[in-house]
């Protein structure tokens, strides 16, 4: 919810966007701005603050050019220019563009979104990811299977084989790192996973509750 950036739920520290509530604390090094012509000026001001303090931003397809608030379109065009070095009132660049500042903030605009362009841009912005999972050849997205653009399916029913993914979530609690890996497909997954940092890992079995050291690290 972009409007949440306008309040006090999020703060910016050391190039990270920090969500800190009683229930959870989450830190984000990369903010993805999907294609769209309209954005709140207050939200974009917060995004600019994130960039000014070393944050990384990836925008795709179409940069905002209009404000959700009345009479503030000029603020939008000015802020977009300051972040990306692009005039959003003109036609979007046909090639990828990037910008950077002295605080190590970086912004990349990707005009044509594909799996490869996104993977390359994210690797440039976050060269040392929290978790790295290799591309699984047998887990293609529905659009890859049907030839549709960006996962948009036309006149095709979704079968069970097209649903699900192998994903993760990382939480920290009482000084411990907790990684939950989930396979929501109906097929087994056999792959390696790379976790940033040096850890002594235990494997927690969600079905039995068994906790055992994980020597394969």
Language model region names:
Residues 1-217:
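Carbohydrate-binding surfaces of carbohydrate-active enzymes
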């Amino acid at each position: 919810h972009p409007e949440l950036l306008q309040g006090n739920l999020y703060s910016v520290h050391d190039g990270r966007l920090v969500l800190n509530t009683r229930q959870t604390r989450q830190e984000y090094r990369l903010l993805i701005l999907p294609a769209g012509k309209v954005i709140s000026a207050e939200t974009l001001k917060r995004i600019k603050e994130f960039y000014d303090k070393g944050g990384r931003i990836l925008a795709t397809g179409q940069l905002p050019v209009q404000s959700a608030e009345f009479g503030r379109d000029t603020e939008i065009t000015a802020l977009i220019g300051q972040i990306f070095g692009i005039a959003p009132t003109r036609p979007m660049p046909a090639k990828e563009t990037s910008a950077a500042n002295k605080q190590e903030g970086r912004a990349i605009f990707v005009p044509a979104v594909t799996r490869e362009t996104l993977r390359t841009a994210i690797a440039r912005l976050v060269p040392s990811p929290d978790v790295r999972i290799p591309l699984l050849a047998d887990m293609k997205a529905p659009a890859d299977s049907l030839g549709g653009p960006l996962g948009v399916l036309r006149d095709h029913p979704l079968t069970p084989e097209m649903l699900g993914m192998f994903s993760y979530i990382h939480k920290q609690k009482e000084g411990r790192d907790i990684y939950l890996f989930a396979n929501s497909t109906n097929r087994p997954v056999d792959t390696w996973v790379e976790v940033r940092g040096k850890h002594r890992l235990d494997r927690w079995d969600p079905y039995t509750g068994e906790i055992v050291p994980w020597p394969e690290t």
